[in-house]
Amino acid sequence: ACCARLCCSVPTSPATTICSSDKFCRCGVCLPSTCPHTVWLLQPTCCCDNRPPPYHVPQPSVPTCFLLNSSQPTPGLESINLTTYTQSSCEPCIPSCC
């Protein structure tokens, strides 16, 4: 898995993670939204392929998929301004990756 070691886990509940495509990371970016991290840490932290992807137009605030595996409320998502990119060559975002 591309980012299994880099995503954080929440001791009290399953981690709520946003998996989105990034222009520099074909396999996806893991944003541990339920962890006490500052916004500057919500940056690309895992890449399966470091090669630059083909040119594409950014789609602001359009996540490719959500992995919400938690019965607890999801804090902080409204205050985080996400800019994601859709790429046809991206691998599917699977729960085992995060």
From Swiss-Prot:
Gene Ontology cellular component annotations, sorted alphabetically: cytosol; keratin filament
Tissue note: Wool.
PANTHER family per record: KERATIN ASSOCIATED PROTEIN 3-3-RELATED, KERATIN-ASSOCIATED PROTEIN 3-3
UniProt protein name: Keratin, high sulfur matrix protein, IIIB3
UniProt keyword list: Acetylation, Keratin
Function: In the wool cortex, wool keratin intermediate filaments are embedded in an interfilamentous matrix, consisting of hair keratin-associated proteins (KRTAP), which are essential for the formation of a rigid and resistant wool shaft through their extensive disulfide bond cross-linking with abundant cysteine residues of wool keratins. The matrix proteins include the high-sulfur and high-glycine-tyrosine keratins.
Positions of post-translational N-acetylalanine modification: 1
Family statement drawn from the similarity comment of this UniProt entry: Belongs to the KRTAP type 3 family.
One family name in Pfam for this protein: Keratin_matx
Keyword Acetylation found: yes
InterPro entries: Keratin_matx
Assembly with partners or alone: Interacts with wool keratins.
GO molecular function, one term: structural molecule activity
The organism's taxonomic lineage, starting at the top: Eukaryota, Metazoa, Chordata, Craniata, Vertebrata
